[in-house]
């Protein structure tokens, strides 16, 4: 029986937020109250919750463990679960317009007002306001337990001077793989918004943390072992930074090219459980550019690559006398804003150098950020016309979510399909080889990105697992 009294509930010792990776970025689906003493049951009949100034809809309240997982029986934690969508996620990340990166919010105020909290049959009121920016629980990033940085001095070809550079790394190293078979390594290169000095952001900004979840890990095998190492690497500016500190246009060489190779090599050398013949490189947007850039510069190192919405330009863009790109701001964000020199940046020599590397490209035909007809499509066509026979392309019509089925994302966000494990089909290479117009022979489809299979494999990850030097 519920008592008529409504005393102030004073059994709460602390409050945390659960941060989770979603297809749109991080969200906060739960508030976790740490208690001074265990309770067996809890419910709430009314109340309100706001996180970071947004009103949230409470969907459930229950006893839980320290990570917010529902428990049966007594516990010294209570979870307040909230509806979470792309429009109301309560993200603790904010976009820094000056740096062109995500960063953690300076504060994350959480306010809970509960006039009818029922705990073990007793009626209470509960009210609290807590800044939770430093009170985060995030299993999605905590499983990436190996954090490091690599610093070295390299020639900046733009300035002509030596420059000290640092790359930050974060790795998923499952204990179940240690000491047995040599296992594959999946390397992830982030997009523009995830640069900086906190590699956790590379996992949450676009759900790269999914690479360590069972659904994807289960595709990777070595002998009787299941799983892969995952290494996410973060640069402090942009992978497309050619040395002037700006986000380049993709027809140049990244200033991070050498240090990235050294960072990868050091990780592989220091982790003897990694199979050097099964190193898979992938990235999206800026990271897709860098994936192709690394193949061009180190074509014999990687066993396979999976660039998404890659921004390595097929064409060479004109430059000013100081080396910066010529851009006509009056033309807006379009190909008309840049000057084409008439030369190719993805030359025949580069195509020949990388055509034997197993590759799987993914893009959405409505990408309005990295235009497919100037980047991924002509590059892919040149590869298959040159005889690349283990090179695949998935093309989607647009980007629709599953974490939030009502959400429709910008066409550039095709990594949503990658991390949702929805890249299952490929385009017809013969039609692309024969195409003579700017449609490149592709037939976009949201049913896996294509109607054919890649050498009989069911999806990108199964194909990736089969690749070895």
Predicted regions and their residues:
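C-terminal catalytic histidine-bearing segment of alpha/beta-hydrolase fold enzymes
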Residues: 360-469
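Mobile cap/lid helix-loop segments that gate and shape the active-site cleft of serine hydrolases
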Residues: 202-217, 290, 294-357, 453-455, ...
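A domain-start/cap signature at the N-terminus of enzymes
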Residues: 2-30, 53-183
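Gly/Ser-rich "nucleophile elbow"/oxyanion-hole loop immediately N-terminal to the catalytic nucleophile
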Residues: 180-181, 243-285
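Active-site machinery of serine-nucleophile hydrolases
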Residues: 185, 192-258
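Short, solvent-exposed loop/turn and secondary-structure capping segments
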Residues: 91-93, 181-182, 196-204, 241-248, ...
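A short glycine/threonine-centered beta-strand motif
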Residues: 27-44
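The conserved beta1-alpha1 loop
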Residues: 189-191, 309, 363-364
């Amino acid at each position: 029986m519920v008592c008529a009294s409504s005393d102030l509930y004073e059994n709460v010792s602390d409050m945390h937020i659960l941060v989770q990776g979603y297809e749109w970025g991080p969200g906060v689906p739960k508030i976790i109250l740490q208690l001074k003493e265990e309770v067996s049951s809890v419910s709430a009949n009314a109340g309100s919750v706001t996180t970071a100034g947004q009103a949230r809809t409470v969907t459930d309240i229950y006893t839980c463990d320290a990570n917010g997982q529902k428990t049966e029986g007594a516990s010294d934690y209570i979870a307040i679960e909230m509806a979470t969508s792309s429009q109301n996620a309560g993200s603790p990340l904010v976009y820094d317009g000056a740096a062109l990166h995500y960063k953690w919010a300076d504060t994350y105020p959480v306010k809970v007002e509960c006039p009818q909290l029922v705990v073990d049959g007793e009626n209470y009121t509960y009210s609290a306001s807590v800044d939770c920016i430093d009170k985060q629980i995030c299993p999605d990033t905590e499983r990436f337990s190996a954090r490091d940085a690599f610093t070295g001095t390299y020639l900046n070809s733009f300035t002509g001077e030596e420059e000290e550079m640092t790359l930050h790394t974060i790795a998923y190293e499952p204990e179940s793989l240690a000491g047995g078979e040599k296992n594959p390594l999946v390397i992830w290169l982030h997009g523009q918004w995830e640069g900086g000095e906190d590699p956790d952001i590379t996992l949450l900004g676009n759900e790269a943390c999914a690479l360590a979840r069972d659904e994807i890990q289960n595709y990777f095998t070595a002998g009787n072992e299941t799983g892969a190492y995952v290494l996410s690497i973060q640069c402090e500016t942009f992978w497309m930074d050619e040395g002037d500190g700006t986000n380049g246009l993709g027809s140049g060489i990244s200033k991070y090219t050498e240090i990235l190779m050294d960072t990868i090599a050091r990780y592989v050398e220091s982790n003897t459980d990694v199979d050097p013949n099964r190193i898979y490189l992938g990235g999206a947007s800026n990271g897709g550019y860098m994936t192709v850039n690394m193949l061009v510069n180190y074509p014999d190192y990687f066993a396979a690559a999976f660039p998404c919405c890659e921004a390595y330009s097929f064409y060479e863009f004109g430059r000013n006398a100081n080396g910066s790109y010529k851009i006509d701001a009056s033309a807006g964000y379009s190909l008309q804003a840049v000057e084409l020199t008439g030369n190719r940046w993805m030359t025949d020599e580069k195509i020949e150098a990388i055509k034997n590397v197993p590759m799987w490209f993914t893009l959405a035909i409505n990408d309005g950020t990295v235009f497919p007809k100037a980047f991924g499509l002509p590059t892919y066509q040149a590869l298959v016309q040159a005889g690349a026979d283990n090179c695949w392309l998935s093309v989607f019509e647009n980007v629709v979510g599953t974490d939030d089925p009502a959400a429709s994302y910008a066409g550039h966000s095709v990594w949503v399909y990658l991390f949702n494990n929805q890249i299952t089909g490929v385009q017809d290479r013969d039609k692309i080889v024969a195409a003579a117009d700017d449609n490149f022979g592709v037939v976009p489809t949201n049913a896996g990105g294509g109607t054919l299979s890649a050498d009989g494999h069911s999806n990108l990850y199964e194909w990736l697992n089969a690749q070895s030097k």
